[in-house]
């Protein structure tokens, strides 16, 4: 009986790790350009999920403590035309689409690594309804 309980606990721990890992997910983002004065919502894919991480009590200066986050490993770019743009302005908007995810260091050159970013649905202008 004890072996069965241990097996069940092991299974549930494995399931918790495997089923909530870093993976592609569908999201909706708001895109805008100042010349267009409108936001539109676009469906795309991005990375979401959990990565094993820890915060050490003793900070060893010789060994950096890098927290891993769920981020893209591969991405492509897609382009849409924004409606309502001024004449002679560039109405094209290019946005990233994740095609593969992994647990790795957050690259602040290409990603908002802050805890409280604006979020994917932030919009400065009114949203254009379809």
UniProtKB/Swiss-Prot annotation:
<keyword id="KW-0964">Secreted</keyword>
<feature type="disulfide bond">
    <location>
        <begin position="39"/>
        <end position="123"/>
    </location>
</feature>
<dbReference type="GO" id="GO:0010628">
    <property type="term" value="P:positive regulation of gene expression"/>
</dbReference>
<feature type="disulfide bond">
    <location>
        <begin position="47"/>
        <end position="101"/>
    </location>
</feature>
<feature type="glycosylation site" description="N-linked (GlcNAc...) asparagine">
    <location>
        <position position="26"/>
    </location>
</feature>
<comment type="subunit">
    <text>Heterodimer. The active follitropin is a heterodimer composed of an alpha chain/CGA shared with other hormones and a unique beta chain/FSHB shown here.</text>
</comment>
<comment type="function">
    <text>Together with the alpha chain CGA constitutes follitropin, the follicle-stimulating hormone, and provides its biological specificity to the hormone heterodimer. Binds FSHR, a G protein-coupled receptor, on target cells to activate downstream signaling pathways. Follitropin is involved in follicle development and spermatogenesis in reproductive organs.</text>
</comment>
<dbReference type="GO" id="GO:0007283">
    <property type="term" value="P:spermatogenesis"/>
</dbReference>
<dbReference type="GO" id="GO:0060011">
    <property type="term" value="P:Sertoli cell proliferation"/>
</dbReference>
<keyword id="KW-0372">Hormone</keyword>
<dbReference type="InterPro" id="IPR018245">
    <property type="entry name" value="Gonadotropin_bsu_CS"/>
</dbReference>
<feature type="disulfide bond">
    <location>
        <begin position="106"/>
        <end position="113"/>
    </location>
</feature>
<comment type="similarity">
    <text>Belongs to the glycoprotein hormones subunit beta family.</text>
</comment>
<keyword id="KW-1015">Disulfide bond</keyword>
<protein>
    <recommendedName>
        <fullName>Follitropin subunit beta</fullName>
    </recommendedName>
</protein>
<dbReference type="GO" id="GO:0005615">
    <property type="term" value="C:extracellular space"/>
</dbReference>
<feature type="glycosylation site" description="N-linked (GlcNAc...) asparagine">
    <location>
        <position position="43"/>
    </location>
</feature>
<keyword id="KW-0732">Signal</keyword>
<dbReference type="GO" id="GO:0016914">
    <property type="term" value="C:follicle-stimulating hormone complex"/>
</dbReference>
<dbReference type="GO" id="GO:0005737">
    <property type="term" value="C:cytoplasm"/>
</dbReference>
<feature type="signal peptide">
    <location>
        <begin position="1"/>
        <end position="20"/>
    </location>
</feature>
<dbReference type="InterPro" id="IPR029034">
    <property type="entry name" value="Cystine-knot_cytokine"/>
</dbReference>
<dbReference type="GO" id="GO:0007179">
    <property type="term" value="P:transforming growth factor beta receptor signaling pathway"/>
</dbReference>
<dbReference type="InterPro" id="IPR001545">
    <property type="entry name" value="Gonadotropin_bsu"/>
</dbReference>
<dbReference type="GO" id="GO:0010469">
    <property type="term" value="P:regulation of signaling receptor activity"/>
</dbReference>
<feature type="disulfide bond">
    <location>
        <begin position="51"/>
        <end position="103"/>
    </location>
</feature>
<dbReference type="GO" id="GO:0001541">
    <property type="term" value="P:ovarian follicle development"/>
</dbReference>
<dbReference type="GO" id="GO:0045670">
    <property type="term" value="P:regulation of osteoclast differentiation"/>
</dbReference>
<keyword id="KW-0325">Glycoprotein</keyword>
<dbReference type="GO" id="GO:0010893">
    <property type="term" value="P:positive regulation of steroid biosynthetic process"/>
</dbReference>
<feature type="disulfide bond">
    <location>
        <begin position="22"/>
        <end position="70"/>
    </location>
</feature>
<feature type="disulfide bond">
    <location>
        <begin position="36"/>
        <end position="85"/>
    </location>
</feature>
<dbReference type="GO" id="GO:0016913">
    <property type="term" value="F:follicle-stimulating hormone activity"/>
</dbReference>
<dbReference type="GO" id="GO:0007186">
    <property type="term" value="P:G protein-coupled receptor signaling pathway"/>
</dbReference>
<dbReference type="Pfam" id="PF00007">
    <property type="entry name" value="Cys_knot"/>
</dbReference>
<dbReference type="GO" id="GO:0042699">
    <property type="term" value="P:follicle-stimulating hormone signaling pathway"/>
</dbReference>
<dbReference type="InterPro" id="IPR006208">
    <property type="entry name" value="Glyco_hormone_CN"/>
</dbReference>
<dbReference type="GO" id="GO:0045780">
    <property type="term" value="P:positive regulation of bone resorption"/>
</dbReference>
């Amino acid at each position: 009986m004890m072996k069965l309980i241990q097996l069940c606990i092991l299974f549930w721990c494995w399931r918790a790790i495997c089923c909530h890992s870093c993976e592609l997910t569908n999201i909706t983002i708001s895109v805008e350009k100042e010349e267009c004065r409108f936001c539109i919502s676009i469906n795309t894919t991005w990375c979401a999920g959990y990565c094993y991480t820890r915060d050490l009590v003793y900070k060893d200066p010789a060994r950096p403590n890098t927290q891993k986050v769920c981020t893209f490993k591969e991405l492509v770019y897609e382009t849409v035309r924004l409606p309502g743009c001024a004449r002679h302005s560039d109405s094209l908007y290019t946005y990233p689409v994740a095609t593969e995810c992994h647990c790795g260091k957050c690259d602040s050159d290409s990603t908002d690594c802050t805890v409280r970013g604006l979020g994917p649905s932030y919009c400065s202008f009114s949203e254009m309804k379809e």
